[in-house]
Amino acid sequence: MTKIIIEVEVRPSEDENKVLQAIRNLFDFENLKEEKSGYTKILVAESHTLLSLQKFHRKLREERILDAARKYLTKNLIGNVITFMLNKQAAAVGKISFVDDEKESPLGPIKVTIEYKDPQALIDWLTPKTAKGVPLWENPIPSDE
């Protein structure tokens, strides 16, 4: 089973549409819900297909950050779940910037959780090993089944 959850806080000073666009710049999703937490809203985008990661896949190549991203995803793999955080401001302009701590993204990070039956196959598709920055292979997108 494939499950992708993207969570992002919308602070009172932020435009919700711009925060939503930051998610859309890197990911597609099937469902979007809004949760309230005090004065803030949390947008939760969900998907059940790896096709939702195609923009992210393409951006990793455009930005030539495959090696760094591979290390980051592998480091954040526990069992069948990969979790990572992205800088919200970078995503707002269509860029990928991984963060290790929520404080690295002043308005809060975009939190991504991917549950997949074969996470190593997913990592190999998203971020293949490279030689001098060139992918050694390009695997097809893994099956959602």
Curated annotation (Swiss-Prot):
Cross-referenced InterPro entries: PAB1135-like (IPR002739), Ribosomal_uL5_dom_sf (IPR022803)
Matches recorded under PANTHER family: UPF0201 PROTEIN TK1335
Classification via NCBIfam families: PRK00447.1
Family: Belongs to the UPF0201 family.
Protein name: UPF0201 protein STK_09490
